[in-house]
């Protein structure tokens, strides 16, 4: 099984935290890092990544022209489709390919997902599993029904068709432009269950996130955690800091709570990975080679031509 994440250098600490959790809980998985930078910084190497690959080194065309169209927010998502293709071509003996966002932490082996990928070419998780909060539902319609912080693809004709289609769309349109119906790589996947044989995975223990706290019961039994009775597999710590803590304040009771415990534990590990200094790392594609900063309006004008 191949697990990969895609980042710019300012997220190395998050990717390292993810990789640690993968190696601890899914030791048979290969953990691959796709890095959207001009060079690999020495600090990135360590025992948790099986390989670190620059996106530009496996890109089929002119990467500088492609990446010039994108902001740092868009960049690491814009390469995901092609990187799936690259991994499927490179690792011919592997049949399961999983993308995880860098701000995810794995708590146990992906038993159910392994089984699902034996029967389904595409496995995706929706943001919401229950109706009830109209603000959350509106947000989901704007940003994407499915959370692309996770995606599972099996080696199959259908899975490859989906990845090829997605990669082609991201090559042309992977922007943060909700007004035009685009939200990076994610909004495209609203169409995937219409076009392809995709499994909407409704196991509560996968892709649990701060936005899940409103409608999900989480409990601890001995040393294990359960979401609506399903064993916890991974948490997506999206919005670490203000956003996640606001969700906890608004939706959790005062006092002790299993999610608060998990959040505090994750933050300790995350911060121990040199988060304060790494998060300030400048993006190497933010400037011309002369050193001059590239204005966002220049990027937008370039993409429109």
Map each language-model feature to its residues:
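Glycosyltransferase catalytic domains, chiefly GT-A lineage
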Residues: 1-305
């Amino acid at each position: 099984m191949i697990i990969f994440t895609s980042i710019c250098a300012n997220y190395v600490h998050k990717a390292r935290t993810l990789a640690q959790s993968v190696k601890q809980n899914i030791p048979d998985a290969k953990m691959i890092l796709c890095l959207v930078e001009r060079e690999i910084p020495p600090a990135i190497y360590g025992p948790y990544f099986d390989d670190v690959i620059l996106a530009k080194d496996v890109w089929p065309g002119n990467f500088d022209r492609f990446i010039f169209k994108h902001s740092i927010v868009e960049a690491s998502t814009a390469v995901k489709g092609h990187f799936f293709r690259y991994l499927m071509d490179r690792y011919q003996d592997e049949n399961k390919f999983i993308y995880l966002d860098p701000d995810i932490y794995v708590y146990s082996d992906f038993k159910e997902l392994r089984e699902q990928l034996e029967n389904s070419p595409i496995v995706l998780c929706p943001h919401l599993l229950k109706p009830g909060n109209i603000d959350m539902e509106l947000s989901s319609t704007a940003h994407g029904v499915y959370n692309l912080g996770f995606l599972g693809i099996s080696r199959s004709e259908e899975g490859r068709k989906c990845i090829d289609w997605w990669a082609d769309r991201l090559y042309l349109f992977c922007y943060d432009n909700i007004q035009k119906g685009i939200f990076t790589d994610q909004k495209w996947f609203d169409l995937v269950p219409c076009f392809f044989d995709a499994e909407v995975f409704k196991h509560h223990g996968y892709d649990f996130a701060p936005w899940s706290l409103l409608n999900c019961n989480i409990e601890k039994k001995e040393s294990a955690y359960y979401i609506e009775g399903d064993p916890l597999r991974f948490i997506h710590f999206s919005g670490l800091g203000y956003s996640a803590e606001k969700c906890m304040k608004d939706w959790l009771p005062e006092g002790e709570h299993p999610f608060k415990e998990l959040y505090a534990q994750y933050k300790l590990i995350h911060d121990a990975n040199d988060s304060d200094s790494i998060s300030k790392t400048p993006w190497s594609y933010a400037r011309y080679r002369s050193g001059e900063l590239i204005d966002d309006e220049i990027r937008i004008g370039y993409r429109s031509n």
